[in-house]
């Protein structure tokens, strides 16, 4: 069971994790543009 959970976790966590990462990247880019 642990192997199945280990393989399933990344599949479910990636779609949930990447939107937050993209938002952070956009926030950093907008901050960099405003600073420049």
Swiss-Prot record:
Cyclopeptide (Val-Pro) cross-link site: 11-19
Pro-peptide region(s): 1-10, 20-36
Keyword Nucleotide-binding: no
This protein's UniProt keywords: Toxin
GO MF annotation list: toxin activity
Superkingdom to which the source organism belongs: Eukaryota
UniProt biotechnology annotation: Amanexitides have a structure closely related to antamanide, a cyclic decapeptide with antidote activity against amatoxins and phallotoxins, and might therefore exhibit the same activity.
Tissue specificity of this protein: Expressed in basidiocarps.
UniProt family annotation: Belongs to the MSDIN fungal toxin family.
Protein name per Swiss-Prot or TrEMBL: Amanexitide proprotein 2
Organism expressing this protein natively: Amanita exitialis
């Amino acid at each position: 069971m642990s192997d199945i959970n280990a393989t399933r976790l990344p599949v479910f966590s990636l779609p949930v994790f990447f939107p937050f990462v993209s938002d952070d990247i956009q926030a950093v880019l907008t901050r960099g543009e405003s600073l420049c």
